[in-house]
């Protein structure tokens, strides 16, 4: 396996893990409620956007 093939495979694996993680996080409202609560503790909209979850933040916080 060449370096470029290895890097390509690694990128695919990372993209898949991110996709699964997003689906799992978004579909479990208990987790979302734990990460963000009404008292201002936990993750904010900006935290989600900076982590690459802008679409999720737009839906959850608006």
Q: What is the role of each PLM region?
A:
Residues 1-7:
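Ankyrin repeat (ANK) tandem alpha-helical domains that serve as protein-protein interaction scaffolds
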Residues 12-62:
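Acidic, low-complexity, intrinsically disordered interaction modules
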